[in-house]
Amino acid sequence: MSFELPALPYAKDALAPHISAETIEYHYGKHHQTYVTNLNNLIKGTAFEGKSLEEIIRSSEGGVFNNAAQVWNHTFYWNCLAPNAGGEPTGKVAEAIAASFGSFADFKAQFTDAAIKNFGSGWTWLVKKSDGKLAIVSTSNAGTPLTTDATPLLTVDVWEHAYYIDYRNARPGYLEHFWALVNWEFVAKNLAA
């Protein structure tokens, strides 16, 4: 069984003007697809063939880990975004954010700051720790909370390929627009899991 590029949960132009169709074409259609292709080539004929993406991530290293984690991270990221989304969360997500960060405004400021300061290529995550509290975690390169006991709730991709076409080297501008796309329904499902 080989892995396939999962379908986007929206049209390629649906996130405009915040993320352009051109960015989606390169980021999803080229970068994400390349991770899928590389992973399939790397696991062919190995003990990883036939395992789930999560099993591979938790038990691999090097190129297999990097490509498997990037496939998973990107799929998760696309689901963290939605057209006509953003705003503030409600319900249990809003309550959990307030309990852990004081307010949504404080959380948003801390998450944005962590993502801006995430040096080089990587991901910034909102996770639920094993004690139930929420935390902001930044990972480098293909790092993912799947290798910890934390549950990922939300992520932003801060590799330059995520924003360079639309925002050049202005990561803060990309993050400002990210908040207009956050799919709080997806975050709520992750929190409830």
Placement of each model-derived feature along the sequence:
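Feature for soluble, non-membrane regions of globular proteins
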Residues: 1-193
